[in-house]
């Protein structure tokens, strides 16, 4: 933040009613109930540590990626931002979807590989491998911080 690094916090906020037929069908195939982690009005949509500060941008999304329906790409481009460093959950879902969408929108993509995680180790490392093969640069979060000092 001291070095003009914009911090963007994202959260998925949805409802069982807003799930698409495709999402409902996919979960049904696996015998899974509707997820309760991102339902509006529940603790699942609240930020844990680190929490956003007043100067940070908060983007609320309804999809895995941070881009569809948020206007974020245009907002960033209008401010001359062309590089994104991703951290967060989950590596194989929201992080990977957002990173690939960032590539499609001509952003440079970096992944703080020790600041992303998945529920399953093989999915985590598989997603990192796929992202790196697609052109993302992976590095520990400390490497990014040291560049900004």
Regions found by a protein language model. Name each.
Residues 2-3, 15-21, 25-149:
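Active-site-adjacent betaalpha module
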